[in-house]
Amino acid sequence: MLFLKLIWLLVSIFLISIIYLRVPRNQGLTSFATKSDLLGSPNSTEKFLNNFTLILIISYYLIAVKLNQMSIIG
Protein backbone atom coordinates (compact mmCIF):
# COMPACT_ATOMS: atom_id res chain seq x y z
CA MET A 1 0.00 0.00 0.00
CA LEU A 2 2.93 2.34 0.69
CA PHE A 3 4.31 1.67 -2.79
CA LEU A 4 0.93 2.52 -4.33
CA LYS A 5 0.77 5.77 -2.36
CA LEU A 6 4.26 6.68 -3.55
CA ILE A 7 3.32 6.06 -7.18
CA TRP A 8 0.12 8.09 -6.67
CA LEU A 9 2.12 10.98 -5.23
CA LEU A 10 4.66 10.91 -8.07
CA VAL A 11 1.91 10.81 -10.71
CA SER A 12 0.14 13.77 -9.10
CA ILE A 13 3.34 15.84 -8.94
CA PHE A 14 4.19 14.97 -12.53
CA LEU A 15 0.67 15.88 -13.70
CA ILE A 16 0.81 19.24 -11.95
CA SER A 17 4.19 20.00 -13.51
CA ILE A 18 3.06 18.98 -17.01
CA ILE A 19 -0.09 21.08 -16.79
CA TYR A 20 1.75 24.16 -15.52
CA LEU A 21 4.72 23.92 -17.88
CA ARG A 22 2.83 23.40 -21.12
CA VAL A 23 2.76 26.35 -23.48
CA PRO A 24 -0.80 27.58 -24.09
CA ARG A 25 -2.13 27.17 -27.61
CA ASN A 26 -3.31 29.92 -29.96
CA GLN A 27 -1.09 32.75 -28.83
CA GLY A 28 -1.05 34.33 -32.25
CA LEU A 29 2.14 35.12 -34.13
CA THR A 30 4.32 34.98 -31.02
CA SER A 31 3.81 31.22 -30.78
CA PHE A 32 5.82 30.70 -33.99
CA ALA A 33 8.92 32.21 -32.41
CA THR A 34 8.70 30.28 -29.14
CA LYS A 35 7.87 26.76 -30.37
CA SER A 36 10.69 24.27 -30.08
CA ASP A 37 11.15 20.94 -31.81
CA LEU A 38 12.58 18.96 -28.91
CA LEU A 39 10.67 15.75 -29.61
CA GLY A 40 10.09 16.18 -33.34
CA SER A 41 7.50 18.33 -35.01
CA PRO A 42 5.35 20.49 -32.72
CA ASN A 43 2.16 18.66 -33.74
CA SER A 44 3.53 15.22 -32.88
CA THR A 45 4.97 16.55 -29.63
CA GLU A 46 1.65 18.08 -28.67
CA LYS A 47 -0.20 14.88 -29.57
CA PHE A 48 2.25 12.83 -27.49
CA LEU A 49 1.88 15.16 -24.50
CA ASN A 50 -1.92 15.08 -24.78
CA ASN A 51 -1.96 11.28 -24.85
CA PHE A 52 0.59 11.02 -22.05
CA THR A 53 -1.36 13.47 -19.89
CA LEU A 54 -4.58 11.53 -20.50
CA ILE A 55 -2.89 8.25 -19.52
CA LEU A 56 -1.53 9.84 -16.34
CA ILE A 57 -4.94 11.28 -15.42
CA ILE A 58 -6.63 7.90 -15.89
CA SER A 59 -3.94 6.13 -13.87
CA TYR A 60 -4.23 8.79 -11.14
CA TYR A 61 -7.96 8.15 -10.80
CA LEU A 62 -7.56 4.36 -10.88
CA ILE A 63 -4.92 4.48 -8.15
CA ALA A 64 -7.12 6.83 -6.10
CA VAL A 65 -10.06 4.42 -6.38
CA LYS A 66 -7.84 1.47 -5.41
CA LEU A 67 -6.42 3.34 -2.41
CA ASN A 68 -9.94 4.30 -1.35
CA GLN A 69 -11.09 0.68 -1.57
CA MET A 70 -8.09 -0.47 0.43
CA SER A 71 -8.74 2.09 3.17
CA ILE A 72 -12.43 1.10 3.42
CA ILE A 73 -11.69 -2.63 3.61
CA GLY A 74 -8.68 -2.56 5.87
UniProtKB/Swiss-Prot annotation:
Location(s) in or outside the cell: Plastid, Chloroplast thylakoid membrane
Membrane topology qualifier: Multi-pass membrane protein
GO cellular component: chloroplast thylakoid membrane
Parts of the chain that traverse the membrane: 1-21, 54-74
Gene Ontology BP term (one): protein secretion
GO MF annotations, alphabetized: protein-transporting ATPase activity
Principal localisation: plastid
Taxonomic superkingdom: Eukaryota
Disulfide bonds: none
InterPro entries: SecG (IPR004692)
Alphabetical keyword list: Chloroplast, Membrane, Plastid, Protein transport, Thylakoid, Translocation, Transmembrane, Transmembrane helix, Transport
Keyword Chloroplast: yes
A Pfam family per the record: SecG
Stored NCBIfam families: secG
Protein family (similarity comment): Belongs to the SecG family.
Function noted in UniProt: Involved in protein export. Participates in an early event of protein translocation across the chloroplast thylakoid membrane (Potential).
Name by which UniProt lists this protein: Probable protein-export membrane protein secG
Source taxonomy: Eukaryota, Sar, Stramenopiles, Ochrophyta, Bacillariophyta
Underlying gene: secG
